[in-house]
């Protein structure tokens, strides 16, 4: 068991990361540590720049996607992703985040989203395909380079 979370089986998703204590909104839930630099965007890869991808150490790769997540991302001093509570999280609640919060494009999840949320988009997307309303809702809980890429790509279209 890590500090405040552990890996458990979860119905229909295999494994997931669950809180072993409660967390308050804006509290850091998981501290990110970069384990390995990757040469591309693969399943469990975290984008840390325009064409930069890494694998995080620990259980971050086991945190499941949700279209209505309870965690978001904030970069730490090493450039890794800390998972931060968007809202209060209860003890024994599954820790989730939206994969669009860390990757501009996500092309390696071809199947239908199975998050079960009332806000489900029915497919896992990257930031570039996220509805504008959702981007606004996630303000302060996404990797800043995603906003920079939005600006860069929208300027290129003009």
Show where each model-derived region lies.
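Conserved catalytic SET/PR domain of SAM-dependent protein methyltransferases, capturing the structural core
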Residues: 1-158
